[in-house]
Amino acid sequence: MIKSQFATLIRVLIDFQKFWVFLSIFCTFLVVFKFDNLMFQKVRRVFQQNRKNSESIQPKLSTVSGSNSGEGMDKRNTGFSNLQQLGGAIFIDDAEDEPPRVKSSEDSRPAPHWLDSPRDSTTLPDIIASTYSDFIDEAEYATKQMLAILETLNPIEEYIELFESSFKAIEVRLPFDVILNDEKKPDWDAIRRKLIMGSLTVNTTSEKPGITTNQMTAIFDAIPFLFDAVACNPELYEYQNTLSMIVMIAMTGNSMIRRQSINAVQALMERNMLDQDFMRDGVVPGLFNIYQSGVGAFQSNDLRMECVQALCQVISYDAIHDRRWLFDNFLPRFSQMLKDPTMHVRKSALHIFGNLGNMFGQKFTEVFLVPHLITLSCDMTWAVRKVACEIFVKVAECASNQVRIDILSPNFVRLLNDPNKWVSFIAYQQLGPFISLFANPDITGLELRNGQVVVRDPVVLEPSVTEQEDPSNSTFSEDTSDDFRTLPKDTWLPEVDFNDDFEYQLGSIDNTQNQKELTTVTTALVKTPKRGERVMDSVLSGINKMFGSLERSSPKSKEVEKIAATFSSPSKRSPLSLHSAVSLIDKFSKRSNPNNPQRFPVFDSANSDSTLSSNSSNNNSSEQQNSTGIAAKCSSTDDLTKLGLEDDDSPDAAEDSDDFTSETRTTSPRGRRIATNAWSKLDIRQKIFLRRLGALPPSFPKKKATHSSSSSPRKSPTRSPLLSSRKKGLLFDFAAPIEIKSSSSDHSETIPVRTANQQQEKADDDKLNTDERQQYMENSGPKFNTDEDSTNDSDSDDEDNDFEKSFVADEDDGEQDDSPLSIEIKSSSSSDFESVSAATPTSQEPVSNEFSLTYWSSNYAISSIEDELKPFGSSSSFTNSPTSNSYLESRFDVMKVNLSPRARSVSFGTNGSPISTSPRRKANSTSEPSPPNTGNLKSDDSIVMLNTEEKEKLGILDFDEMNMSISSNSSIHGEAAMTEDSDISLTSIEQAALQHVPVDLVESYMRVMGPIGGSGSGGGGNGSSTTIATGDPSLCAETYRHCAHNFPAVCYTLGRAAWPRLKLVFRKLAMDEQARVRQSISHSIHEIANMLGQEITDEDLLPVFYDLRNDQNPDVRNGILIHLYDFVKFLSPEKRDEMILSLPQFFPIGAQPGNQAQNGDWRSRFELISQLSKLCSLYSIQDVNFHMSGIALTLADDRVAEVRREAVMLVSTIVGALVTAEWDNIKGVRDIENGHVDVKKKSNKTDFLSEQFVDDIVSSFAKTQKWTRRQTFCFICAQILRDKQCDGIQFRYFFATPLQQLAQDKVPNVRLASCEALSVWRKTLIAARAQERRGQSPISSPASEPSAIRRDINLVSDMMVKLSNDSDIDAAFIAKKCQGLTDDHQPVDVASRTTRMREREEQFFGDIILSYSPGCNARVSGKEIKQLIRHDQGAVQKAAPLQSMEDFGDEILAHAADSVNIQTPPEVVATVQRVSITNEQFEDNTEAVDMEIEEDEDENSTEKKENTEKTAEEESENVKNTEDELDIPMDPAPTLPPPVTSKNQSSSPITASSSDNNETSA
């Protein structure tokens, strides 16, 4: 009971819920309906109000001007009431166009009568009249129809009146009062000026009508056609101003009209239809007005963008030819676009930088374009930076080479490392073209002439030779470039003072070029700076900056430690060059205060040679003037020339060599003496650091005076003499070469005599150095662990003395250049000093200054040659002490004092003696080698050396070391290890021959590929390939393709000197997994071979050539095949012989005869034949005959006609080469008299290659059953004569006999080809006869001609006469044409051909049996019926029904073997049996066959057939008629085999037919 009540309650609640849901839905519907109704009424009221406003604004037409105005008004008033009746049948040209609508039923107007008329020239006057209508919709529709009809009128000259009426109808609606001139014509110039100035009032409320928006839209759709019609017809020239005014008025309209006007202007500029005056006075000012009115206003950015694009097209389309007007009026406003906040505006403006540079020259490019390009390449929007990359090369082409190096090159490298993948991708695409701009033929020896690379000897630059002019700037005259050097007023540049700075920089560049003209240093005399010195210059600058910040505030030391940890940590370190590490230090120093007084003070080195009193007197002034830090004075990390260090030479020598040292010095601290005033300003930490670098302490004035007459030390060449722009006071200089003497019998001679002053100075310096180091260790005590083992304590004192001597022992030798270096070492067992030497007693070699890596002074060396150094940052002393201040201090754990047998003192910090605590020492502590013998040390042993692995990771290997590293890798891992895992570094690229190209650009290019395996795995690689297109393998792949495409340009720019580095990139590109990359290399390998020469081509390019030849991709193989000759000609003779042996490997697979599988590779066979024709000139006739003749004859029988035709040319070339080489011997051996023989006399057994080759041709082509081969032989003969490979006598000897036989061939195509060959032979003989006559007297007679030529001409003429009567009409026509008996312009007479075809038909169908009527046959001969053959119908059995065929299928197959014959159904009565009554012989006329035929029958096949027919006729006469005669089966149907009753039923069909014959005749 309770459950039922609960269920009832639930049911009621559910019904109640449904009711409320329904009610809510109903209420919602009412609300929405009411709202929609209100909105609809509101929208309708707004629409009606707008309609009324638009109608009130439209002007009324009061008077109509023109000849057709009266007619127009009359025609407009015709009945418009038929509009309701027309309904949907109204004529509409365009689906979007609608005819004028009726406002309401009460306000109906008459419809124009042309509304349902065709749109042609007959109704055009009525339509023009309707354009004057007061009704806006009618006028708009009429305007559209009028313009549509005008475009269909052709030619325009016949409809000039209609065009004039149309232009007047448009002109009358111009919304302003026309200003008339004295001749009562519109003064358009005055109207244009007032319209531009805004003083011309546009009427919108007057009675004069105006052009509506729809009319303007229709006009702009047809504006190109209207301008073209006006320009092509002089009668319409006066209306060009009308159209121009419409364009200008549209620029002042609403946004939609403006957009259409801009589009129309772009179309007209593209077609060059706008007048120059109109462009200057109307279009350009109007476009700038639209652009500037939208800045900061409520205007669509799309409209502004279209306006900017139109302005850029003014430059790109060269629409204005006045350069000065553009420079003064266009450029200032254009510069405002470059700082527009809209990204798209800046992008569009960037695109025309290249056009502006070509237009205004080099000076303008450097003053205006380069600053803007650099600024926009740093834009916050990546799309703008991407466009900057795209036009970077175009701008660089217009700039000077110095601007490219100093300004553009660093910024381009920054774009290569852009964080956005698209920017980096585009930059790497442009990297190759940008590098190619630095090409210098005088250095590389490669020059472009007419698009071809020409190799010439490099020219050493003479002192008077200035910097080479850029080829891209050759179009700029000097006067034109100077005209646009000064920017016009109101031109915006990125910074206020940037222009002055940039002009100053350009001035300094000009001064540099002037200095280069006067310098006496040539490229050949410039030496490569030492790599260790360059590294130390950069590291010293970075340490200098860190010291300044470290002294200023202690928290900055953590950042120094962080940078140092980044350099040393193996997990964070990447195998980049040391320059990248120094860049990080430079970034750190940029954040510090540039005016820090705690940095290295700057002093003038000119005062370093003065006396002590002068130094002390000027000390205060120099401190005040040079209190700024070194970072503020140095422009880069390598520029330390502001730090004054003393030279150890006399003032006179310094003055004499001032000009030389300004160009050739380097900033290495080794061997340089620090100025006294500078030394006094250094703290103890900086002093210790400089002393460890090999710098000498300040000297006393007395010592200066003593050695004032000493010669100046050797100066080191500068790093880049081409980049030095001004003379600078240098920081460091090299000391003289050091010579170490051994303590032998001449001990007294090698030890220099030390004066008392020198010994006192020595002692003072030792004391000073000891105090300084002790103070330094005390100050840095908390940072270093001074606990030591007992073993280290015992040797600390002696080691400390040794370390002190390492800094001060060479002080005196720096002053005397020619004095030998004596190193005094105090032995542990004796107190005497001994002199040691690194040379043998018999030969004493001086120690050269040109070390491969000079981190330290020459007083340091590795303790053992076998003791290799660990990689950079792997030392435990540095890893365990992250608080270490520099990487250099961490490297002391592997160094020691030269020839010191014990460990160093505790002054090295954390781990005490570095020798005992070094990780390598601990590993080899049990078997530590003894110190090397001093007498066996070479000069290179006295320097600090790094192992090859460490130098690879630092990127400082030279060429020899890199080659050694490659060879070692190849010996372990093979060739793949060399090409995949070798690090491509370019530190050594800074040679004298490669200083014309910025190193960073080339290094970036070489690091694109990186390890092949690294790019795919995504980790482990460290080249630029891992940073470009991160996360997008497709972009990486595309970058590799561009790298391969630009490789020839880079190779051309760098020359042969850079090939040891480019070789690795080349191999990786050739082994790339992408077919397109390999394809680019295969298509350009011949150009690379041209640049590199024979030796490099043989060693490096030839293996790659073989690999690409066997590539699986056909496009790659095709690139190798196309340039086969171009590559082989750059090989040495030995390699050429190897190449010709591999020619069969180029033979395509589908070329073998009988291979029908691959017929699509015929283009490869075609290209192979053309290349072999060129290769004949590179080889001897024996090689050509042995290796190329077989390929030529094989491809001469190819299936493709193009291949055969090209093979014929190769055969002709080979024949010519062989005959030319052996003809003289053949004439003597074969006894050829008078240059002619009829039969070859080969009694002599001497074999000639030419005769053997010709015999092969004759036997393979002329005497064969295949007619295509015989035809090819005729082509070979004709080609030999065309190419003049043989003269008339030679051709008569080799080819005349088989050619005469083929002239009577049974195939018409062969006779036709032989006719062409005979024609060429005849022309050759006639030319030879004319030449003989010119050589004789003018009155020579035909009898005096050589008998051989005259007889050959007669022979050929007789053969041509026979061919002129040939049965084939084509062969006959060619023969007559060759004899001059017919003309090409005369029609061909086909009557004879028709007669011959009828004769052939009658001969073929002369006597056959045809079906005459149902049940009988007829024998027909021509048109006459010879005999009727009747058939007995009783003997014919009916065929089985079709539906029962399946039932008897098995029985048919079972009795197939026993069946004698199969009867035909009664409806099939056919006979195609040829019979012969008489003894007439009918041969198969093979002359009529115009296709390939089988010729396997014997010569007596025709006689056998005749005998068979005669035997059959004789047997048929003896056979009697039987009841069951059979028909001749034609297409027998399968039926049941009848029972065989007698032997007569199994008689042959011919017998049956013969019996019928007998019956009929009886």
Curated annotation (Swiss-Prot):
One of its GO terms (cellular component) is cytoplasm. PROSITE patterns: HEAT_REPEAT. Residues 98-120, 588-672, 695-726, 741-847, 905-943, 1480-1562 are annotated as: Disordered. Residues 838-847, 907-937, 1541-1562 have a biased composition (Polar residues). GO terms for molecular function: protein domain specific binding; protein phosphatase activator activity; protein phosphatase regulator activity. Residues 605-627, 708-724, 819-837 have a biased composition (Low complexity). Residues 1479-1528 form a coiled coil. InterPro entries: ARM-like (IPR011989), ARM-type_fold (IPR016024), HEAT_type_2 (IPR021133), PP2A_Regulatory_Subunit_A (IPR051023). Residues 1531-1540 have a biased composition (Pro residues). The keyword Repeat applies. Serine/threonine-protein phosphatase 4 (PP4) occurs in different assemblies of the catalytic and one or more regulatory subunits. The catalytic subunit is likely to be pph-4.1. Interacts (via C-terminus) with mel-26 (probably via MATH domain); the interaction targets ppfr-1 for ubiquitin-mediated proteolysis. This is Serine/threonine-protein phosphatase 4 regulatory subunit 1. It comes from Caenorhabditis elegans. The lineage of its organism: Eukaryota, Metazoa, Ecdysozoa, Nematoda, Chromadorea.
